[in-house]
Each structure stands twice: as structure tokens, then as C-alpha cells.
Amino acid sequence: MQANSRAFFLLIAVIAFGLVGYALYLQHVEGLQPCPLCVLQRFAFVGIGVFSLLAALSSATRLLWHGLGMLSGLGGIFVAGYHVSLLLNPKASCGIDPIENWVNALPTAKWLPQVFESDGLCTAPLPPVLGVSIPLWSLIWMVILALTLVVAMIRRERR
């Protein structure tokens, strides 16, 4: 598949939306409540998905959407990395999280609370998936998607 092609961006969007779908499965079927950092990671995956979908649909503004998708991924890497660091050092987390108040005050938490409302604790122990913590999986996928978009941008610029 050619980087920067319509199919490339559609694949990135499907993966990103699929990961959000899996997060919703974990929340609504398995009963795992998302913490504020989980919700921010959902925003990043949704951003990657939406901007990749827009890049697939519009060749005239593809570069803009591609860049915004990369920025969403890089922001997601930062949030997921911070989340993993909290799990490695749970004493760094305090009981009341000001990020939760901010996330739950966003309009999206009111419009789609089943997707964007935060009720969990960032350091709560979660069952691993295939032996890996859920925040680490999020970081891994965020790196894969962001790096794929960055490499595609570099290849595009070399042409």
C-alpha cells in the first residue's frame, strides 16, 4: 500500500477507531472505568482517526489533515507515556485528580458521557491484556500510529 494513499489513511483511521471501540468494550462490557488519562488517550485516538479519515477523503487538504493526525498521535504518546510512568510510580499520584475535573467539564463529557466521561483512577490495577497493561498497549499503539504517520510524511516530502 502506498503511503499517503487513500487506502493508507483509511487503514490508519480504521485502526484508531477500532482501538477506541475496544476501549468502549472494556468499559461497557468488562466494567473497567476510564481514568482521565484514558479519556485523553481516547481523544488522541479519535483525533488520529478523524484526521486520517479526512486525509483519505480530501486530496486537496491531505497535508493539513495528515499533520493534524500526527500531532494527535504525538499528544497521545505524551499522555500514554505519562500514564505508564504513573503506573510504574503509583506514589506520584494523589487521590484527587484535577485532570478528572477538567476532562469531565469538557463539552464532550456532557454530549457523550459513555465515551468521554472519566470515573476511574489512573493508578487503579487493571487486568493485563496478553500480559501487558492497558496503558502500555495504548502507548504502543500510539507510537505505531504516530510513527507511521511521521514516516509517511517524510516519504511524501522526499518526493
Curated annotation (Swiss-Prot):
Where is coiled-coil annotated?
A: none
Q: Which residues lie on this side of the membrane: Periplasmic?
A: 26-43, 82-136
Q: How does it sit in the membrane?
A: Multi-pass membrane protein
Identify the keywords attached in UniProt to this record, alphabetized.
Cell inner membrane, Cell membrane, Chaperone, Disulfide bond, Electron transport, Membrane, Oxidoreductase, Redox-active center, Transmembrane, Transmembrane helix, Transport
Pfam families the UniProt entry points to: DsbB (PF02600)
Where can this protein be found?
Cell inner membrane
Entry's Gene3D superfamilies?
A: DsbB-like (1.20.1550.10)
Q: Topological domains (Cytoplasmic): residue ranges?
A: 1-8, 58-63, 156-159
Q: What GO terms describe the biological role, i.e. biological process, of this protein? A: protein folding
GO cellular component terms given for this protein: plasma membrane
| Molecular-function GO term, any one | protein-disulfide reductase activity
- In this UniProt entry, which cysteines form S-S bonds? 35-38, 94-122
NCBIfam families xrefs: PRK02110.1
Tell me which family the UniProt entry assigns to this protein: Belongs to the DsbB family.
User: Per its database record, what is this protein's job?
Assistant: Required for disulfide bond formation in some periplasmic proteins. Acts by oxidizing the DsbA protein.
Can you say what this protein is called? Disulfide bond formation protein B
| Organism phylogeny | Bacteria, Pseudomonadati, Pseudomonadota, Betaproteobacteria, Burkholderiales
